[in-house]
Amino acid sequence: MRRALLALSIPLATTALAQTPLPSHGPAKGYLVITGGVPDYKNFLALAGGKDAHIVVIPTAAITGPGEKRLPPYCSAPGPFAGLKCTVLHTIDRKVADSLKFVAPLRDATGVYLEGGRHWRLADAYLGTLTLKGIFALLDRGGVVMGGSAGATIQGSFMVRGSSDPDDNTIMMAPGHLVGFGLFTNATIDQHVDARGRENDLAPVMKAHPELLGIGLDESTSITVHGDTLTCNGPRRAAIWDGKDHYGKGYYYLRAGDTLNTATRVATLVSHPPDP
């Protein structure tokens, strides 16, 4: 049975770093579903309107070159959005991404799915364009954006693992590719943490930028961000890097049902069985 919630800064005995962390904010009206790699279609589609959803898929991060044509059947069987109103948008041409014709499907969309791959491709194609403005407008209407892996990291304001030349995602801070979409402000997001042994990879980023809220997602974990509330949906963990020392680590874990006020950095935890 779910026990009483405990509201506290975890842990109580922490040491703040010299620079005070800044508040982080998600969309005031809309929602972000951010996953460590495995898509959370259930929560995404529920927030997008269920059978009445209009989904826009942006697969750009996964497309390796102009000749790439082998895309999954997102909008048709057996794809995840079969039977729904669904549109695929892709370009690497910034002029196209900044055109009214290209962004037209976003005007009445209720959900955007950002495919995984290399998030620098998303940044290069869409930062500063009408496409990104259309995504923000969708959130202002109460819509939802979901992304895992690259589609997770791009949602933050500070982009890690963004190196394009060389194309090396072990480089945590790549000059020229540090700016994400900023759907989640003053935040940086890492992914595939448990599957790829990335538990401490955010440490140098947080040392250089202690004002940020850092989030490290296990591969099967999703979080939902709405306003100043981050909810961990599970089933695994979300590591929260909040600029404090937590018994020798720079982070602590949220699990399914736990929430975080991203403005105050106060976590609200539920009772969980011990890890096996």
Regions found by a protein language model. Give the residues of each.
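Extracytoplasmic/secreted cell-surface and envelope-processing proteins
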Residues: 64-70, 96-98, 120-124, 154-156, ...
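A short, aliphatic-rich alpha-helical micro-motif
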Residues: 106-107, 139
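Structural recognition of the beta-strand scaffold that forms the well-ordered cores
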Residues: 33-35, 54-59, 87-89, 111-115, ...
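Bacterial N-terminal signal peptides
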Residues: 4-15
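Class I SAM-dependent methyltransferase SAM-binding "motif I" and its flanking Rossmann-like core
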Residues: 115, 121-196
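C-terminal and late-domain segments of enzyme folds
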Residues: 19-51, 62-69, 76-81, 159-276
